Amino acid sequence: MKPPILTIIMSTVISGTIMVLISSHWLTVWIGFEMNMLAIVPILMKKFNPRAMEASTKYFLTQATASMLLMLGIIINLLLTGQWTVLNMPNPIASNTMTVALAMKLGLSPFHFWVPEVTQGVPLSSGMILLTWQKIAPLSILYQISPSTNPNLLMTMAALSVLVGGWGGLNQTQLRKILAYSSIAHMGWMIAVTTYNPTLMMLNLAIYIMMTLGTFMLFMLNSSTTTLSLSHVWNKLPLTTSLILMIMLSLGGLPPLSGFIPKWMIIHELTKNNMIIMATFMAITALLNLYFYMRLTYATALTMFPSTNIMKMKWQFENTKNTTLLPPLIVISTMLLPLTPMMLSLF
């Protein structure tokens, strides 16, 4: 894609999200979602092949359905209250309709069907935007309407999401699908705490975005898309591969890495609100995510896959990719745990 066209499309994606973030009027929120959705489709189709076309079509159809449901909820709310204000959501039918629409946009279970397929069908850079930036706008609206949402509906979707996110990733060898299922599980953790502490949900989102950005950037640095290709990178770039494994273990929530913080704080919040069974269930399902990341770490670092290469180290050209953002992302993704007491006092 030519740089001027890419600049226009990316600025539209960013503008759409910012419009959703700053709007207090439902119509401008809906317009922001539409701008964002229409601009992201060309980014998903950056590599013009049948797989990318299929992924873009699945994404477009799902998001269009979610937008229609969102507009339906907005109209129901307008008819009953006569107001377009985002914070004014007294009717349970309107709030439930909007919650389902936002769940479809986020890829929460049982509306998760599109997330692994779309992520697998697009390039790594497009998948990175899909699993990070595209989560901000729906979660910001969910944050604003959280006092009006149905806790039982949110808890059901959260429980299904953490279960599907852990279970679905167990038999995957494609790194993009593993990250997609991990995204579903993380969204489940965020949704679980929305009713009780929405600010904690936004902290979880920030840490999740940092970890996922770091993982995708390291994958793009060495062009890894499968477990096999990642194991071969160990010969070429052992330091980079070890950083990938550290961030992936952080995504799995292994202490003492940063990914343990949101899980710890969310379980603490749920326990404080007498949701003992839900907290226990989520802690157990988190082990599924940790298991497939540990398995990936073992397969990459502690075993050597069959290779036609007879030399231990490979000849390599000088890397020309921009890595400016990687050091701070890696530090944030792995070393934030000592700051947890301060975060607990804030949230």
UniProtKB/Swiss-Prot annotation:
**In its keyword annotation, does this UniProt entry include Cell membrane?**
no
One GO molecular function term of this record is: NADH dehydrogenase (ubiquinone) activity
Q: What class of enzyme is it?
A: translocase
Q: Which residues form a coiled coil?
A: none
Q: Is the Cell division keyword given for this protein?
A: no
Please name the GO terms of the biological process aspect recorded for this protein, alphabetically.
Answer: mitochondrial electron transport, NADH to ubiquinone; mitochondrial respiratory chain complex I assembly
For membrane topology, the record states: Multi-pass membrane protein
Q: Which GO terms describe its cellular component?
A: mitochondrial inner membrane
Q: Which UniProt keywords apply?
A: Electron transport, Membrane, Mitochondrion, Mitochondrion inner membrane, NAD, Respiratory chain, Translocase, Transmembrane, Transmembrane helix, Transport, Ubiquinone
InterPro entries, per the entry: Complex_I_Subunit_2, NADH_DH_su2_C, NADH_UbQ_OxRdtase_chain2, ND/Mrp_TM
Q: What parts of the sequence cross the membrane? A: 5-22, 26-45, 60-80, 150-170, 178-198, 200-220, 242-262, 274-294, 324-344
Q: What is its EC number?
A: 7.1.1.2
* Subcellular location(s) of the protein: Mitochondrion inner membrane
What does it catalyze?
Answer: a ubiquinone + NADH + 5 H(+)(in) = a ubiquinol + NAD(+) + 4 H(+)(out)
| Summary of subunit composition and partner proteins | Core subunit of respiratory chain NADH dehydrogenase (Complex I) which is composed of 45 different subunits. Interacts with TMEM242.
Q: Which family does it belong to?
A: Belongs to the complex I subunit 2 family.
PANTHER family, alphabetized:
NADH-UBIQUINONE OXIDOREDUCTASE CHAIN 2
- Function, in words: Core subunit of the mitochondrial membrane respiratory chain NADH dehydrogenase (Complex I) which catalyzes electron transfer from NADH through the respiratory chain, using ubiquinone as an electron acceptor. Essential for the catalytic activity and assembly of complex I.
Q: What is this protein called?
A: NADH-ubiquinone oxidoreductase chain 2
The record lists the organism as Martes flavigula (Yellow-throated marten)
Q: What phylogenetic lineage does the species belong to?
A: Eukaryota, Metazoa, Chordata, Craniata, Vertebrata
